[in-house]
Curated annotation (Swiss-Prot):
This is NADPH-dependent 7-cyano-7-deazaguanine reductase. Pfam families: QueF. Substrate binds at residues 80-82, 99-100. Its main location: cytoplasm. It comes from Bdellovibrio bacteriovorus (strain ATCC 15356 / DSM 50701 / NCIMB 9529 / HD100). Signal peptide: none annotated. NCBIfam families: QueF-II (TIGR03139). Pathway: tRNA modification; tRNA-queuosine biosynthesis. It is found in: Cytoplasm.
Amino acid sequence: MKKKNGRDSKELADFALGESQTNYPETYAPEVLEAFDNKNPGKIAWTTFVCTEFTSLCPKTRQPDFAKIFINYIADKKMVESKSLKLYLFSFRNHGDFHEDCVQTICDDLVKLMKPKYIEVIGEFTPRGGIAIYPYANYAAKDKFFQELYKKRMSEYAPGKYSMELSKLY
C-alpha cells in the first residue's frame, strides 16, 4: 500500500509543527529544537536555512542587534525541524550576547541536536556605530572528506561568500 505522505503519522506526532497554539519563548531556549530522521543518511546533500529577522541584545548596552543568519549543513542521521528552528532563533530576541557568541552558540546547539556531517553558521549583523560584524562558525564530523571541507570553507571564508543576497529570496 502506497503512503499518501513521505512520512507516517507516528513519525510526525511529537513535533510542534501544526499545533494550534504556538508558544514563543521569552528567553534563550535550545530545548525547543526538534530533529527528525534523515531518510537519506548515506547521501551528501546541502540544506540551507536563511533567517532574515534575527534579533539579539548587546550584553553591555541591552540595545537590539539585527542580523541575517545563514545555516548551511549536510545532515547525517538527523535533520532540524524548521518551525522549531524558527522558535529557537526567535528565543535570542531577549538574550544578551555578542554577535560572535550568538553564532557559535547556534552552531554548537545544532551540532548537539543533529550531529551533522558538516555545518556552518554565518551571521550578517546590521552595522552599529559604523561597524559591520559577520561572524562565521563551522563544524565537521571526523570523516576525512568533511574535515577537508571544514578546512577549505574556513580558509576561503569571506563576508558574503557562503550567504546570498536577499533579492534572491523574494
